[in-house]
């Protein structure tokens, strides 16, 4: 079975990395506008909870901030509270220029 989702949205929460038991994570929410069918329709926005782990968590925290636009590939999971969470698996950069980041040092090349 295939469980992949690609999302583009704006980060709606402040970002921080939490480390527990030698694993890091960053929990954040994104707002995604639904496409309008015509010019008179109002824009509807959905909010999704996302989780990034380890290197992805550090990259999200270093490269993005609240209000920033993010694009990523992930998978859907049920959280213990029965809500759906998107697990971030791959970051995708939208800029014209490629960015390479050393996650350990935070250096951008």
Model-based region annotation:
Residues 1-109:
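Single-stranded nucleic acid-binding surfaces, predominantly the OB-fold ssDNA-binding core
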């Amino acid at each position: 079975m295939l469980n992949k989702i690609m999302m583009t949205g704006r980060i709606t929460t402040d970002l921080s990395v939490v480390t527990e038991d030698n694993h890091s994570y960053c929990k954040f929410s994104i707002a995604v506008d639904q496409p309008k069918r015509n010019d008179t329709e109002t824009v509807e926005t959905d909010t999704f909870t996302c989780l990034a782990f380890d290197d992805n968590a550090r990259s999200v925290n270093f490269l993005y901030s609240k209000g920033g636009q993010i694009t990523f590939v992930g998978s859907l999971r049920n959280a213990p509270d029965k809500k759906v969470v998107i697990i971030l698996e791959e970051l995708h950069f939208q800029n014209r220029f490629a960015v390479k980041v050393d996650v350990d040092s935070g250096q951008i090349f």
